[in-house]
Regions:
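Glycine-centered flexibility motif
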Residues: 9-12, 45, 73, 79, ...
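Face-selective signature of the C-terminal outer-membrane beta-barrel domain
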Residues: 87-240
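Flexible, solvent-exposed coil segments and beta strand-coil junctions
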Residues: 2-8, 63-77, 186-197
Length: 240
C-alpha cells in the first residue's frame, strides 16, 4: 500500500505566513504457507511552516490590524519570515509474525525513527533590537498618554516625538522587519572587520529512537490466554 499527500499555502490568513507539508506511507507484506510472514512499513511528514507573533494592543492600534505579524518583512521585494519551523520524523517498522501452531503466535518487531526539529529566530549582537515592535520603537516610549501626573514624559518635545513615532508606524514597511537594512548593516560591519550584527539563529532538537520488541501469545484453555513479551529500546537526543 502506498499513499502520498501534499498540502501547501503560499500565503496564510495572517500576512507573512506560509505552510508546506508532504506526507507519505508505504507498506508491504509477504506471507508463507509455513506460518511465517514479514511486513515492512514506513511513513513520514516533512513540514515547513512560518509563525505568527503576538504583540501589544498599542501595536495593533497603530497597524489598525489585530492580525499584525511582527515576524516578517520584505527582502529584495519578497516576503521573508524570521520564524520558520522545519519538522520531519521519518519512521519505519519491520515485523515478523510466526504462527507456531493453532494456539500460539510469536510477533517480533524492530522500530526506528529519526525526528528532526528546527526553529529559527532573528537575533542581534551589539546592535539595536531588529524587531519592529520592540518597545523603544513605540510611541509610548516617548510620551505617556495615560498618566497626566507624570511630567517626565509629557513635555512638548516628548509629544512631538510621540507624533513622529506614530507617523513612522503608519508606514507599513516601517512596522515590518527591515531585512535589506540588516544586510547592509552587516556588510558595513564586515568592511570594518567586525562580526555580523544581525543573524538568524537556528535551534535544533533531533532524536533517534530504536525499539526491538517481541511477544508470545498462547491459548492455555477455553477462556485463558498467556502473554509474555520483551522490549528493548534506546533513545538518543541532540539539542543545539
Amino acid at each position: 500500500a502506498t499513499n502520498i499527500t501534499y498540502r501547501w499555502a503560499n500565503r496564510g490568513y495572517v500576512e507573512g505566513t506560509f505552510y508546506n507539508a508532504l506526507s507519505y506511507f508505504f507498506g508491504v507484506q509477504k506471507k508463507w504457507n509455513n506460518g511465517h510472514s514479514l511486513s515492512f512499513s514506513t511513513w513520514g511528514n516533512p513540514t515547513e511552516r512560518s509563525s505568527q507573533g503576538a504583540s501589544t494592543d498599542e501595536v495593533y492600534w497603530l497597524a489598525n490590524n489585530y492580525q499584525y505579524n511582527p515576524y516578517w518583512g520584505y527582502q529584495n521585494g519578497r516576503r521573508r519570515n524570521s520564524r520558520v519551523v522545519n519538522d520531519f520524523a521519518p519512521a519505519a517498522i519491520f515485523t515478523w509474525d510466526w504462527n507456531i501452531n493453532d494456539k500460539t503466535t510469536l510477533t517480533t518487531s524492530l522500530f526506528g525513527m529519526y525526528s528532526m526539529y528546527k526553529s529559527t529566530k532573528l537575533n542581534y549582537n551589539n546592535a539595536d533590537n531588529p524587531q519592529p515592535d520592540y518597545w523603544k520603537n513605540l510611541p509610548s516610549s516617548y510620551y505617556d498618554v495615560w498618566n497626566e501626573q507624570d511630567t517626565r514624559y509629557r513635555t512638548a518635545q516628548a509629544f512631538a516625538d510621540w507624533n513622529t513615532a506614530v507617523n513612522w508606524w503608519r508606514n507599513k514597511e516601517n512596522r515590518q522587519i527591515q531585512w535589506d537594512r540588516l544586510y547592509y548593516a552587516n556588510r558595513q560591519a564586515a568592511a570594518n572587520g567586525q562580526d555580523a550584527l544581525y543573524y538568524v539563529q537556528a535551534k535544533h532538537n533531533n532524536n533517534t529512537t530504536i525499539t526491538l520488541s517481541s511477544s508470545l501469545n498462547t491459548h492455555i484453555g477455553k477462556d485463558k490466554v498467556f502473554n509474555v513479551g520483551l522490549m528493548i529500546g534506546q533513545n538518543l537526543g541532540r539539542h543545539y
